[in-house]
């Protein structure tokens, strides 16, 4: 994990071709890789000082690249062209042939994956297609420091059908930490962050984990879809176990237990239900908060059903064998399960 991560891959003076007039104008060109601050892109500045002054550059997002090529010398000397899938192009010239070749190789590697893991251009790489495919499912995030982890900084976040993984930004094969989706208590996002609260089931321990990212909405939708799929799977298991309990208890009234289907509350309703007792205390404390804290308090959350359904499955398993663990599960008119 990189705490001093720099997204600048290459930079230098070039002459960029204007899209409107077709005139080559000298500028300072910065090529940035994708990170928590934004996607892979070219930034054009008037000069090198403008970068230090954090001026507003003209940005070209480098996505959907068809090819990177060198223009023939008779057409334009020391020129490099980026061709996009919509047949548009960005062309620039360099001060020397060596500089043009360096730009060409760098753009080929970063935009097309022509070289992975220090494999030279032109040599076949049997692992490259799989690695590239896996990379497309990872999001650029910056993990903020938290008490439970001794790592933080720029990294890659991956969401599978069962887990959330963090991968090292420099070595994509090094896994840093993981969280089972069924251990998430809640999760949410805003314009610049994705946050989730994990329970005690995960190796990293319970706590709140916050990531700075420009892809918060996409991450949220992936997590939301995966947790819904887990919830549906557990619900099917739950219904099957209820059916088996009825068959086992059929005709044995002495050992039968009331086993009504568990009510599946919507996420929003369930979140309101468990926080209803805290509304009075939170309302008084909210008024005393500053503007930034109030914005954080309005952060969009979604409650994860998976842990609740897992607990319901455990309850039915206990009913099936006629054993209940005192202190963990209480059978009352309104069943309460803590996890």
UniProtKB/Swiss-Prot annotation:
Interacts with RET and TEK/TIE2. Interaction with RET is mediated through the PTB domain and requires phosphorylation of RET. Disulfide bonds: none annotated. DOK proteins are enzymatically inert adaptor or scaffolding proteins. They provide a docking platform for the assembly of multimolecular signaling complexes. DOK4 functions in RET-mediated neurite outgrowth and plays a positive role in activation of the MAP kinase pathway. Putative link with downstream effectors of RET in neuronal differentiation. May be involved in the regulation of the immune response induced by T-cells. Residues 132-237 form the IRS-type PTB domain. Keywords: Phosphoprotein. One of its GO terms (biological process) is cell surface receptor protein tyrosine kinase signaling pathway. PROSITE patterns: IRS_PTB. Phosphorylated on tyrosine residues in response to insulin, IGF1 or RET stimulation. Belongs to the DOK family. Type B subfamily. The keyword Mitochondrion does not apply. A motif (DKFBH motif) lies at residues 265-275. GO terms for cellular component: cytoplasm. This is Docking protein 4. PTB domain mediates receptor interaction. Residues 7-112 form the PH domain.
């Amino acid at each position: 994990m990189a705490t001093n991560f720099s997204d600048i891959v290459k930079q230098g003076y070039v002459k960029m071709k204007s899209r409107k007039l077709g005139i080559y104008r000298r500028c300072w060109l910065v090529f940035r890789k994708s990170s928590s601050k934004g996607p892979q892109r070219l930034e054009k500045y008037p000069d090198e000082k403008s970068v230090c002054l954090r001026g507003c550059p003209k940005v070209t997002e480098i996505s959907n690249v068809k090819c990177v090529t060198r223009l023939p010398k008779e057409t334009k000397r020391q020129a490099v062209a980026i061709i996009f899938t919509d047949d548009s192009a960005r062309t620039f010239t360099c001060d020397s042939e060596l500089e043009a070749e360096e730009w060409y190789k760098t753009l080929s590697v970063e935009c097309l994956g022509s070289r992975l893991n220090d494999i030279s251009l032109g040599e076949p790489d049997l692992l490259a297609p799989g690695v590239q495919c896996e990379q497309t499912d990872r999001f650029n995030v910056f993990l903020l420091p938290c008490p439970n982890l001794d790592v933080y900084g720029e990294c890659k976040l991956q969401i599978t059908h069962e887990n959330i993984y963090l991968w090292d930004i420099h070595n994509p094969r090094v896994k840093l930490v993981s969280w089972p989706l069924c251990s998430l208590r809640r999760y949410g996002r805003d314009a610049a962050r994705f946050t989730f609260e994990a329970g005690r089931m995960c190796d990293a321990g319970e706590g709140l984990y916050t990531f700075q990212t420009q892809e918060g909405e996409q991450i949220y939708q992936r997590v939301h879809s995966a947790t819904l799929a887990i919830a549906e799977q557990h619900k099917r298991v739950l219904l099957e176990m209820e059916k088996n309990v009825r068959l086992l208890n059929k005709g044995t009234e002495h050992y039968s237990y009331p086993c009504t289907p568990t009510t599946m509350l919507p996420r929003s309703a369930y979140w309101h239900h468990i926080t209803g007792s805290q509304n009075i205390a939170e309302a008084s404390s909210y008024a005393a908060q500053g503007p930034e804290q109030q914005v954080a308090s309005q952060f969009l959350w979604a409650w994860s059903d998976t842990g609740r359904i897992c607990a319901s499955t455990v309850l039915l398993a206990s009913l099936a064998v006629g054993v209940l663990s005192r202190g963990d599960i209480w059978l009352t008119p309104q069943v309460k399960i803590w996890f």
